[in-house]
Amino acid sequence: MACIVEDPQRAGQSNETQIALISGVPDDISKSCLARVPREYHMAMKCVSRRWRDFVCSDEMCDYRNEFNLAESWIYALCRDISGGVFLHMLNPFSSRRSWKRINDYPYIPMREGMGFAVLGKRLFVLGGCGWLEDATDEIYCYDAAMNTWFDVVPPLSTKRCYFACETLDGKIIAIGGLGLNPNAKRTWDIYDPLTRTCKSCSDVNIVPEMEDSFVMDGRIYIRGGVGGSSTAVYSASSGIWERMDDDMASGWRGPAVVVAGDLYVLDQTFGAKLTMWCKDTRMWIHIGKLSQLVMKQPCRLVSIGNSIFVIGKDCSTVVIDVENVRKNKMNGVMVCSSIPKTWDDDIDVISCKSVAI
């Protein structure tokens, strides 16, 4: 994947490139060896030398690990504390001591709300937003998970917006609807292409107002909004148009949604928390089970890794659901799941969650 942000200039890099990654070993073999090191050790590897650091942080390293199924997905939660400050928490689900950790402070928009959150490759993007004393903005910021660094991204969104849906499709970031200085913003969407560094705006009357939730499945973007989330629409990149969502499918979309192995799961938080699945063959919603309220606090966000759904609630209280085994392991209708407790006393709201594979 091509570089999509401006990296800081590194002094003396030309001299370092003449030094082998591993003494006496060709660089292609050295890169193959380094790419096989588990992700939890990458931070230590960056301390060995500048060349090791540059390779570990590179798109080449990320692409190699993805190509040979070596990539490991970590979860990143965009959070807000009681003071209104915005920051990131990270979870390594493969660690023997699974716990959330706060990472680099978010330096640009400490009090902003209604932001979009998206991931492309090894980079997370925070888009738009507004504040009590700040109008909707078109700014885009990028966090490189390999470099552990924030960057300012250009160009900005075509439309200043907040409280909008944000998804990635075909290698592009799509910001949909929401509110903005332009009253027509709620009927528009922006397509940001990181390869060409261009952002174009499109409009369609079928885009639903007051955006609440969205997901991507089978090459389409689904959005839900309106009063009580009663309006839905679906976008196909091949046609470039928005259409009304199927009524049967829309009827069961009553909470945050996530796609696992091509199947759609929804966490209905109307009365407690219950997990449902959309069956494509019968075109019906199937009740999977309930979640215990003792290990998590609503409202919750969902993110998937492999066959597992991570239900992330207030204060980053987390429940892990294995969708292959959950139907067999239930007690009185309550799903048997593993949990990851919070490790701090602060009051934290989770805005959005994404996984980044490196």
UniProtKB/Swiss-Prot annotation:
<feature type="repeat" description="Kelch 6">
    <location>
        <begin position="308"/>
        <end position="355"/>
    </location>
</feature>
<dbReference type="GO" id="GO:0009409">
    <property type="term" value="P:response to cold"/>
</dbReference>
<comment type="subunit">
    <text>Part of a SCF (SKP1-cullin-F-box) protein ligase complex. Interacts with SKP1A/ASK1.</text>
</comment>
<dbReference type="GO" id="GO:0016567">
    <property type="term" value="P:protein ubiquitination"/>
</dbReference>
<keyword id="KW-0880">Kelch repeat</keyword>
<dbReference type="InterPro" id="IPR036047">
    <property type="entry name" value="F-box-like_dom_sf"/>
</dbReference>
<feature type="repeat" description="Kelch 5">
    <location>
        <begin position="271"/>
        <end position="307"/>
    </location>
</feature>
<comment type="pathway">
    <text>Protein modification; protein ubiquitination.</text>
</comment>
<feature type="repeat" description="Kelch 1">
    <location>
        <begin position="78"/>
        <end position="122"/>
    </location>
</feature>
<feature type="domain" description="F-box">
    <location>
        <begin position="20"/>
        <end position="67"/>
    </location>
</feature>
<dbReference type="InterPro" id="IPR015915">
    <property type="entry name" value="Kelch-typ_b-propeller"/>
</dbReference>
<feature type="repeat" description="Kelch 3">
    <location>
        <begin position="173"/>
        <end position="219"/>
    </location>
</feature>
<dbReference type="InterPro" id="IPR001810">
    <property type="entry name" value="F-box_dom"/>
</dbReference>
<keyword id="KW-0833">Ubl conjugation pathway</keyword>
<feature type="repeat" description="Kelch 2">
    <location>
        <begin position="123"/>
        <end position="171"/>
    </location>
</feature>
<protein>
    <recommendedName>
        <fullName>F-box/kelch-repeat protein SKIP4</fullName>
    </recommendedName>
</protein>
<feature type="repeat" description="Kelch 4">
    <location>
        <begin position="220"/>
        <end position="269"/>
    </location>
</feature>
<dbReference type="Pfam" id="PF01344">
    <property type="entry name" value="Kelch_1"/>
</dbReference>
<dbReference type="InterPro" id="IPR006652">
    <property type="entry name" value="Kelch_1"/>
</dbReference>
<dbReference type="Pfam" id="PF00646">
    <property type="entry name" value="F-box"/>
</dbReference>
<keyword id="KW-0677">Repeat</keyword>
